[in-house]
């Protein structure tokens, strides 16, 4: 096993070296970075050319420059990273430029990847369990459509209809009666298709979901919820109950009375602690408070499960602990919506509630309120995350469906059914785990594809992150060069001397006459 892991690690390093070499050489040969200066009539053009050639070692072939840069990368292992400098950014170190952009890109990519995996696998499993149903055909058609869509087109459509048109709707949020009816019927059809079973069961599912969704939308419209949204303790209770129902259904089933009792106690404790948590969130106004509350509620859930779990205390504790940890989501949403009025007053009127430009609002970033900043980040991340998620979601749906169908036809699944195990136990405990093995193999590839899509998405939504940095570097056609440690001091002197000779200086990436 150790030999196998070693071989894989060595192969990974070799792949990284070859890939970085190819990208570096392609970038270096994408164009002449001195082309504008060569045709310039500026009297200092030749001095500027000499300066840039000395700073970036343009007098050396790209292969030698690559190994010079690779030496700076290798120094990262001893804590002396040197990825070179970016002349386009006023000789800013590349490591600083990447550090400022990497956080926003990872935030966006991780959110899109996690949501795509969770939602895609859930939809894929339900379509596999309802094979050849109307629901299966509709989802199959939609996934093929989504998988074929170009990312830039999806991003532009979301920007138009998900932000511009939706912000116009929020100016006068009135929902026509026919829209409520159509949405209710569609949701009822989806619910009846997922539930399946006999005709009577389908009709009950269709009617209950359609009436519930239609009534909820009508209530939100009448109470003008879209003008001043809020959750409150009632919303926290409903979201917590929905989360608990999903977890119990997939984990133990509602027939497990001890699990239902333990989860019920956790829900009651969450609602009982809602008011004290208001003071905690007010005085501990920090993102770490979310982690603290999640750990606290998960610990309470595990403790309750161990107390009331009986012989199956491990399963009950796991279920109750998971429900307890997830209760932090409605609590955080409640805190964010409490800042809605302040958020609306601080954002520029031209931006709208659903933002289409940048990763945050500068006026809100300066406010020392973690919940307000979370709300601002959520409105800015919503559309880019959906744009990145929708294509990956289609892929995960298809893979999950095919994998689960293959596993469900295996002999050990038939044996489990023959022994009298329930369908939920067969699917969740035996089939689901093995069906996830092929999914795990494509996550790394999909993560790289999402990063590639982020380059385009960030440009559409004007995010100053890795995508915009990549575009900027490609357009400038300037490859950074790492420097040996003993050459840095001499290089600084050379840059000062070249500036003095040229009679100009670099200011924010622009040449200024002395």
Predicted regions and their residues:
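Alpha-helical transmembrane anchor segments
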Residues: 133-170, 174-179, 189-202
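C-terminal transmembrane helix and the adjacent membrane-cytosol boundary/short C-terminal tail
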Residues: 483-493, 497-506, 513-514
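Hydrophobic alpha-helical transmembrane segments of membrane transport/permease proteins
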Residues: 15-64, 172-178, 338-372
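Short hydrophobic, aromatic-rich alpha-helical segments embedded in or entering the lipid bilayer
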Residues: 44-77, 461-473
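Alpha-helical transmembrane segments of integral membrane proteins
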Residues: 2, 111-125, 184-479, 483-484
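An internal, D/E-rich "acidic patch" concept
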Residues: 59-121
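Membrane-spanning helices that line or support transport/gating and their immediate boundary helices
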Residues: 8, 25, 29-37, 121-125, ...
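Generic alpha-helical transmembrane segments of integral inner-membrane proteins
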Residues: 9, 13-25, 106, 110, ...
């Amino acid at each position: 096993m150790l030999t196998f892991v070693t071989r894989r690690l060595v192969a990974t390093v070799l792949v990284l070296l070859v890939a970085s070499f190819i990208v570096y050489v392609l970038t270096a040969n994408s164009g002449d970075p001195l082309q504008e200066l060569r045709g310039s009539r500026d009297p200092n053009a030749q001095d500027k050319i000499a300066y840039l050639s000395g700073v970036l070692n343009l007098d050396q072939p790209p292969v030698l420059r690559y190994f010079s840069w690779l030496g700076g990368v290798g120094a990262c292992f001893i804590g002396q990273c040197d990825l070179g400098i970016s002349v386009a950014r006023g000789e800013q170190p590349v490591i600083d430029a990447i550090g400022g952009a990497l956080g926003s890109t990872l935030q966006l990519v991780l959110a899109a990847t996690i949501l795509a995996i969770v939602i895609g696998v859930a939809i894929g499993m339900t379509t596999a369990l309802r094979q050849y149903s109307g629901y299966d055909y509709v989802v199959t058609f939609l996934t093929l459509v989504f998988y074929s869509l170009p990312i830039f087109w999806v991003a532009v459509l979301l920007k138009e209809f998900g932000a511009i048109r939706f912000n116009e709707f929020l100016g006068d949020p009135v929902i026509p009666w026919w829209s409520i009816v159509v949405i209710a019927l569609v949701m009822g059809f989806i619910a009846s298709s997922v539930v399946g079973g006999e005709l009577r069961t389908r009709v009950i599912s269709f009617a209950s979901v359609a009436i519930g969704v239609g009534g909820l939308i009508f209530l939100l419209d009448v109470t003008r919820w879209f003008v001043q949204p809020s959750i409150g303790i009632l919303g926290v209770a409903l979201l917590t109950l929905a989360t608990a129902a999903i977890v119990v259904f997939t984990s133990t089933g509602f027939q497990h009375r001890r699990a239902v009792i333990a989860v019920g106690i956790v829900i009651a404790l969450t609602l009982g602690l809602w008011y004290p948590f208001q003071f905690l969130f007010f005085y501990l106004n920090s993102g770490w408070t979310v982690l603290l509350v999640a750990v606290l509620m998960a610990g309470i859930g595990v403790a309750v499960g161990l107390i009331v779990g009986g012989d199956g205390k491990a399963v009950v504790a796991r279920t109750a602990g998971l429900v307890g940890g997830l209760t932090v989501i409605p609590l955080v949403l409640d805190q964010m919506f409490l800042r809605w009025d302040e958020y609306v007053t601080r954002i520029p009127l031209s931006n709208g509630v659903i933002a289409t430009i940048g990763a945050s609002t500068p006026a809100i970033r300066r406010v020392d309120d973690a919940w307000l900043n979370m709300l601002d980040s959520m409105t800015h991340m919503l559309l880019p995350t959906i744009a990145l998620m929708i294509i990956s979601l289609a892929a995960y749906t298809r893979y999950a469906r095919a994998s689960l169908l293959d596993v469900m036809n295996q002999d050990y699944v038939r044996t489990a059914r023959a022994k009298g195990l329930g369908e939920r136990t067969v699917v969740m405990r035996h089939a689901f785990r093995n069906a996830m093995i092929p999914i795990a193999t494509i996550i790394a590839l999909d993560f790289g594809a999402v990063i590639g899509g982020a380059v385009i998405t960030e440009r559409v939504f004007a995010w100053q992150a890795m995508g915009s940095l990549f575009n900027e570097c490609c357009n400038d056609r300037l490859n950074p060069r790492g420097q040996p440690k003993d050459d840095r001091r001499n290089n600084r002197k050379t840059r000062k001397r070249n500036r003095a000779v040229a009679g100009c200086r670099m200011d924010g990436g622009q040449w200024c006459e002395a």
